[in-house]
């Protein structure tokens, strides 16, 4: 019998037992898989769940207690869950991606196993759009390279020296920016770009007609048209099996000679080997990438290590302190809706609803009538936000989850490339929930 049939102790595939909550049951376990700061999530979940962290980068690093007992999981983009990984979780009912993108989760397999997958689609729209414009401005005005020249001791005084060090700087007004994917982030980028004087084109075959008139943009019907007419191309679509390596050796040759390329969406959209070659040959004048095929990114290895005129940042376009707190709060609220309501009906942003084979109603729970000693609390209640500490010195919320050999001196701290490239005029199918649900984060 396969492992997937053993997950639920005899229940059919895709049907998982409900979370048992209420006065006669312990609080269910919710785990943050790839982080260790739960201070934002705790106030939202502490009366309905025990919250723990794993700080793992793979399921091999997740403690057996979480694999056996966790009913909910929170995760960022730094861990990947394949079907094999998902089958290790015996009681999991919901995963919430703290961010918009969810290409690091096999959502179909999760649905087959009865696990709902949710995201935070409006997360970091402003931050990602701002970061995109920052990259575009850097490419046009060469700010990064000018700074680097001064840091390296280059003397810049005469007009000739300025011309030399600022070679390649260009005027923005009148240039054409091509946006691939006009979801939330794409629209925010378009509005900012227009304010800087760009003519803005976009390609999005799955967006309804009319948005271009409302925003004052020009729509093109094929990817080839956008690449041919754009001085700078920026990507704002999700990643799936249809658009992996959307920018490849073939599509690079369809771009204008000397165009710029910006990617703050998903690393797999760009064939980095083809990009490196295009940068070396000058077919692409400059590129700025916040996301990469292999993360964490390093200039010391991979095809981009010797590429000229390249700006790289570490998948941070989404980040601001405000955005981080907002997305964590919303992710925690989604977990709470799952525990106290019905899956998937009570969920706000379930991305694999069509794949779920069953929806189990979980009894609602009134925390006001739950006695602490019967609500999974083996220790007395503390003021809001305080986590008690077990005799071992490990916070009670994580005791038995973090291996005893690990010293904790503190509490919870504040697709394969398709065999052929897209042909001219071919539409490229994005995923159903792209960055209108995006990743950029």
From Swiss-Prot:
Q: Where is the composition biased (Basic and acidic residues)?
A: 430-441
Q: What is its main location?
A: cytoplasm
Please indicate if the UniProt record lists Ubl conjugation as a keyword. Answer: yes
Q: Where in the cell is it found?
A: Cytoplasm; Nucleus
Alphabetized InterPro entries for the sequence? CtBP, CTBP_dehydrogenase, D-isomer_2_OHA_DH_cat_dom, D-isomer_DH_CS, D-isomer_DH_CS1, D-isomer_DH_NAD-bd, NAD(P)-bd_dom_sf
Has the keyword Glycoprotein been applied to this entry? no
**What PROSITE patterns does its record include?**
D_2_HYDROXYACID_DH_1, D_2_HYDROXYACID_DH_3
Give the GO molecular function terms: chromatin binding; identical protein binding; lncRNA binding; NAD binding; oxidoreductase activity, acting on the CH-OH group of donors, NAD or NADP as acceptor; protein domain specific binding; RNA polymerase II-specific DNA-binding transcription factor binding; transcription corepressor activity
Q: What tissues has this protein been observed in?
A: Expressed in a wide range of adult tissues.
Positions annotated as active site in the UniProt record: 266, 295, 315 (proton donor)
Annotated site residue numbers, Cleavage: 375-376, 388-389, 410-411
**Keyword set for this entry?**
ADP-ribosylation, Cytoplasm, Differentiation, Isopeptide bond, NAD, Nucleus, Oxidoreductase, Phosphoprotein, Repressor, Transcription, Transcription regulation, Ubl conjugation
Instruction: Quote the PTM field.
Output: ADP-ribosylated; when cells are exposed to brefeldin A.
Which GO CC annotations does the UniProt entry carry?
GABA-ergic synapse; glutamatergic synapse; nucleoplasm; nucleus; presynaptic active zone cytoplasmic component; transcription repressor complex
The positions annotated for binding NAD(+) are 100, 180-185, 204, 237-243, 264-266, 290, 315-318
Protein's UniProt name: C-terminal-binding protein 1
For this chain's record, the cofactor binding note is: Cofactor binding induces a conformational change.
Q: How does it assemble?
A: Homo- or heterodimer. Heterodimer with CTBP2. Interacts with ELK3 (via its PXDLS motif). Interacts with RBBP8 (via its PXDLS motif). Interacts with PNN, MECOM and ZFHX1B. Interacts with ZNF366 (via PXDLS motif). Interaction with SATB1 (non-acetylated form); the interaction stabilizes its attachment to DNA and promotes transcription repression. Interacts with PRDM16; the interaction represses white adipose tissue (WAT)-specific genes expression. Interacts with GLIS2, HIPK2, FOXP1, FOXP2, HDAC4, HDAC5, HDAC9, NRIP1, WIZ and ZNF217.
Where Phosphoserine occurs, the residues are 300, 423
- EC class: oxidoreductase
Q: Name one GO biological process term.
A: synaptic vesicle clustering
Listed SUPFAM superfamilies: Formate/glycerate dehydrogenase catalytic domain-like, NAD(P)-binding Rossmann-fold domains
The residue stretches assigned to a coiled coil in this entry are: none
Family in the record: Belongs to the D-isomer specific 2-hydroxyacid dehydrogenase family.
Q: Glycyl lysine isopeptide (Lys-Gly) (interchain with G-Cter in SUMO) cross-link position in this chain?
A: 429
Species this chain originates from: Mus musculus (Mouse)
Stretches the record annotates as Interaction with GLIS2 1: 1-70
């Amino acid at each position: 019998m396969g492992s997937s049939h053993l997950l639920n102790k005899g229940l059919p595939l895709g049907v998982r037992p409900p979370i048992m909550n209420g006065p006669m049951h312990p609080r269910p376990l919710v785990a943050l898989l790839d982080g260790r700061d739960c201070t934002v999530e705790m106030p939202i979940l502490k009366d309905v769940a025990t919250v723990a962290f794993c700080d793992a980068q793979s399921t091999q690093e997740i403690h057996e207690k979480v694999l056996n007992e966790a009913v909910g999981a929170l995760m960022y983009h730094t861990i990947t869950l394949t079907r094999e990984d998902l089958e290790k979780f015996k009681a999991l009912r919901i995963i919430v991606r703290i961010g918009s993108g969810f290409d690091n989760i096999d959502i179909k397999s999760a649905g087959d196993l009865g696990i709902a997958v949710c995201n935070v689609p409006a997360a970091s729209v402003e931050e990602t759009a701002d970061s995109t414009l920052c990259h575009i401005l850097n490419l046009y005005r060469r700010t990064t390279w000018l700074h680097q020249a001064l840091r390296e001791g280059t003397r810049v005084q005469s007009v000739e020296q300025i011309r030399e060090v600022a070679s390649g700087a260009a005027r923005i007004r009148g240039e054409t920016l091509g946006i691939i994917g006009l979801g939330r982030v794409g629209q925010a980028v378009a509005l900012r770009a227009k304010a800087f004087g760009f003519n803005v084109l976009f390609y999005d075959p799955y967006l309804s007609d009319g948005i271009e008139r409302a925003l004052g943009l020009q729509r093109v019907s094929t990817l080839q048209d956008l690449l041919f007419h754009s001085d700078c191309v920026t990507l704002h679509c999700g990643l799936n099996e249809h658009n992996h390596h959307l920018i490849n050796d073939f599509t690079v040759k369809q771009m204008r000679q000397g165009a710029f390329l910006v990617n703050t969406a998903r690393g797999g959209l760009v064939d980095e080997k083809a990009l490196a070659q295009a940068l070396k040959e000058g077919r692409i004048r400059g590129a700025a990438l916040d996301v990469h095929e292999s993360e964490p990114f390093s200039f010391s290895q991979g095809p981009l290590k010797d590429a000229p005129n390249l700006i790289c940042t570490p998948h941070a376009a989404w980040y601001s302190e405000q955005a981080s707190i907002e997305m964590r709060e919303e992710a925690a609220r989604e977990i709470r809706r799952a525990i106290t309501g019905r899956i998937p009906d009570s969920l706000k942003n379930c991305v694999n609803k069509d794949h779920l084979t069953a929806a189990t109603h979980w009894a609602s729970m009134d925390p006001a009538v739950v006695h602490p000693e019967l609500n999974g609390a083996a220790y007395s209640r503390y003021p809001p936000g305080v986590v008690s500490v077990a005799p071992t010195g490990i916070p009670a919320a994580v005791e038995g989850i973090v291996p005893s050999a690990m010293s904790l001196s503190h509490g919870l701290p504040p697709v394969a490339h398709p065999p052929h490239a897209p042909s001219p005029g071919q539409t490229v199918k994005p995923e159903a929930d792209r960055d209108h649900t995006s990743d950029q984060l």
